[in-house]
Amino acid sequence: MPNPNQTIVVRLRNWVGDVTLAVPMLQRLADAGLDLRLVGKGWARDLLAGHGWPVQVLPKTMAERVRLLRDMGRDARRDGSLNGLCLPDSFSSALEFRLAGLRALGHAWEGRSLLLARAVPRPRGVHELEVYWRLGSALLGQDAALPAAIGLHLADSHLAQADGLRHKHGIEPGCILICPFAGGTWNQVDKTWPGFADFVARDLQAFGRRVVVCPGPGEEAIAQAQFPSALMLPGVGLGAYAALLRDAAVMVSNDTGPGHLAAAVGAPLVSVMGPSDPALWRPWGPTVQLLGGDGQWPSAQAVRAAVARTLLGR
């Protein structure tokens, strides 16, 4: 097990869902006394602000990334112990740690074993949260039971931003949030529920609640065209988004990052999955109702019933 206060430079992954699912492992390392120094996408700093970990923005070029990793690890121990944690499985991410002179732990994947100070097999057939949890166990040298919930911390600034949005747009408590978007595909199959627009127009409006959508960059036109009845809040940061979710009556989401975000703050979530494998990628937590998956989309009636169970208790 690393010594208390030992500096560990952590390279985060590039998707909101992945970073969210890694939060319990990162908090476990911090609770063990490790000095975490994170590097990832620009949005990760806002997402993780409530935990107080410093997050550097990942540069675009390899030379800049190596220079940044070297600077971040300047205070790390150089006695042969591990001082890096590489969460991505790419060859380049392991190479950057090696060129920066850091001894990183990561998955034995794509011929990376010679670049990492310690390479462990990537588990197959387990949920992605457990994949990261096991990496934390390997770093600490001890196993621990999987957490029941993610427990994403919100910063005071996140709560203030969410309050400002509610006041500005007249959003009352008990609204419904939707995330009808989906980044990427599953085995080259679109993860966007084909019935989402009709469901919002015909079924969700019947509950008499304000419906809110927070499109990400490039999603505004889809939100406006396909979900005209919803209040659109573009440009909302992930921290404020999480704070809005925490106080929502329910969220209905595709298999995408904001769905994991809702589960991470304990919001009631109806997770609509189609091609994805729920055993590997379902949102994690006790407030999740999972519908579909493994190549099957749920019916609108099933999604409506799940929303009704949350809102009406039946």
Language-model region placement:
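Catalytic machinery of carbohydrate-active enzymes
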Residues: 1-314
